Amino acid sequence: MTQNEFHKLVHLVMDSKAQPPENLFAGGMDSWRARARLAHFLAMDEIDKKDEANELFHSVVEADYNEEISEEVEEYAFALQKLSALEKEQGKFDEALSHINTAIEAAEGTDFLYKYILRGELWADRWNLLHKMDLTADAEKEVDERIEAYKDIPIEHNSYLYYGYRFKAQLAAARGVTLVAKDYMHMAIHAMEIPEKYQAGLEKAFAADHDNASWILTEVDKATPNPDMLHWDI
């Protein structure tokens, strides 16, 4: 992609409903962070420039990010996470797995508490992808290892536990084991911050006494606050 093509896409994004400031893309094609940021916007459904987003995300894979700066580590991991998601949509599962692994490696390489990405969510992306690739047993083993490593740590809001138990709940639901699915989802919810205004909706969702586990989990998800908007300790 040329600088001219890059700047045309910047203005396309700036004219969209998102309306990001132009300085977000300072440095143009010479800046991996500018390329990653533009790619995120291009990948949005309302802009739908997935091919261009894919090209820009791929250009970031070999970026020389500064491991001492949390914002750079986070931005790099977030870009690889989104690239993996795009590749998963395209059925390119091996490439998607490689890139989510790279995102996890980057995020886990430091002790930073990130602002926008969650370590547990990165792992969940990997587990869901393994499940999609019929490697569910491998995913379950990793989930159990994460839960065992973190379940007794005195940390109240733990993304590893939330996403780990949630994954186990989804598997139980797919297998038709409703009570087990609900139990795991209770454990998942216990690992996250739940503002008071969400309590009634969650109680109602969990109170369902039928055997459609997938429906119950969908209702629980609807009643659960967006994890991106909550405080996490890890």
Task: Show the residue positions of the predicted features.
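Structural motif corresponding to the intra-repeat A-B loop/turn of tetratricopeptide repeats
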Residues: 45-47, 90, 133, 168, ...
